[in-house]
């Protein structure tokens, strides 16, 4: 049954049908944990697709099916500054699903590569966070200490604050570190407004930015105004 879906996807010229077949295969893997029999590498042909949805679905399948042959293409998407964010996100999820030392090494090498933009590094840190939260926290702080645009720091903090283990990793790594006042304020604003309101993280951010306790009592609007100066 599942093998037939892969056959139909390969033979169909309709983008909507291709997506329907590939999505059914994706759900079968995610929900029922089953793969089609036969040659799974046939899904690789869809990595040539110009349709982002088809490409992303096929990429997720390649990762979940552990198709190492797809790895170089996925890495290239993440190295290319012109790649669409949708494709980058799918490539990261796929590499995480493949797992292994190759994935961990690739993420870290790209994060520390000075040729990559801050946007690229932020995307990669979000991926690394799912595999190595402590190392991701270390890389994130290094990025936050050198980030040119305070607003960009928000997406770094948000990635950690949404997860308890990640928040703890960032809190531990921040101890004894220094951040610019604006970056620290940005992190505090996000931490203060999050449902979990992590007090330990707020405290180390206050110390890292050299902020006085009174600034903790600023309203959200006042904090935003200070950050945007």
Per-range role (PLM):
Residues 1-229:
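Long, ordered, helix-rich scaffold segments
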């Amino acid at each position: 049954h599942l093998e037939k879906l892969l056959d139909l996807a390969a033979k169909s010229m309709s983008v909507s049908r291709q997506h329907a077949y590939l999505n059914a295969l994706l759900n079968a893997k995610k929900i029922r944990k089953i793969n089609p029999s036969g040659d799974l590498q046939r899904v690789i042909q869809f990595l040539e697709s110009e349709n982002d949805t088809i490409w992303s679905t096929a990429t997720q399948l390649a990762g979940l099916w552990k198709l190492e042959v797809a790895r170089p293409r996925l890495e290239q998407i993440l190295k290319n500054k012109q790649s669409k964010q949708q494709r980058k996100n799918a490539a990261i999820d796929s590499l995480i699903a493949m797992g292994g030392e190759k994935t961990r090494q690739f993420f870290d090498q790209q994060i520390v590569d000075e040729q990559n933009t801050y946007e690229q590094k932020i995307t990669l840190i979000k991926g690394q966070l799912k595999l190595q939260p402590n190392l991701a926290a270390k890389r994130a702080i290094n990025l936050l200490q050198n980030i040119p645009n305070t607003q960009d720091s928000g997406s770094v903090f948000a990635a950690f604050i949404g997860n308890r283990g990640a928040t703890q990793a960032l809190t531990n790594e921040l101890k004894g570190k220094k951040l610019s006042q604006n970056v620290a304020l940005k992190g505090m604003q996000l931490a203060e407004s999050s449902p979990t309101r992590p007090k330990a993280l707020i405290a180390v951010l206050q110390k890292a930015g050299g902020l006085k306790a009174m600034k903790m009592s600023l309203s959200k609007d006042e904090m935003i105004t200070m950050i945007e100066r």
